[in-house]
Amino acid sequence: MSPTQLLVPTYTQMLRAQSAWLDKAVAPRQAAGEEPDAAMTLRLAPDMYPLAAQVRFSCFQAMEPVHRLRGEPLPAALLALREAGWNADAQPGSPADAQAIIAGTLAFLGELAPDALDGGAALPISLELPNGTAFDMTGEQYARDWALPQFYFHAIAAYAILRHHGVELGKADYVPHMLAYVRPGTIPQG
């Protein structure tokens, strides 16, 4: 499987799901007369980033590999998105802001050619973390061992935050794209 075939559909499916999770988080708050923006400050633990950051990081992690696997520097707008994730406590934004970030990321991914990232499989990738830790790997290793796990970490954190705070989410909300593969007549009734 090529890097493009692996990453782009995965990111697209999960970001669409994440958008639906946000919708499910907002509706009951609005119905109860609560401020929906407060949902963006929810978190699992005091030392974890809030929901706003998890959404921003999910989108950052979906776009970062596109640039790295094409040998391009990360654009200023993408670095600003990561910075906004780091600063989400001070500026959590609103669910509408989060939806706009997701929509922009989906549009960006949707514009990619079917083989846009394939030339990067053997490309040497150097990744430096803010704490100074550095990794050297191939594009294939980067896609498999960093890009996908990092994306899923933040997507799952967003899901877990919402679930932990009472949003009615289940497995079908997490992997709605799997419904396309259901064998007819096999979904239990009731």
PLM regions with names:
Residues E140-P188:
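C-terminal or internal capping secondary-structure element at the end of a domain, subdomain, or sheet
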Residues P3, L7-L15:
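A conserved active-site cap/scaffold subdomain adjacent to cofactor or substrate pockets
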Residues R29-T41, G110-A143, V175:
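Acidic interhelical loop/turn segments
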Residues L15, S19-V26, M63-V66, A103-G110, ...:
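Structural signal for well-ordered, non-membrane alpha-helices
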Residues K24, E35-A39, A90-D97:
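Aromatic-rich, lipid-facing transmembrane alpha helices and their immediate juxtamembrane interface loops
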Residues M1, P75, A80, A84, ...:
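Mature, function-bearing regions of proteins
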Residues T10, P46-L51, A143-Q150:
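Secondary-structure capping and boundary motifs in well-ordered enzyme cores
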Residues M48-R82:
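Conserved alpha-helical segments that form or flank metal/cofactor-binding pockets of metalloenzymes
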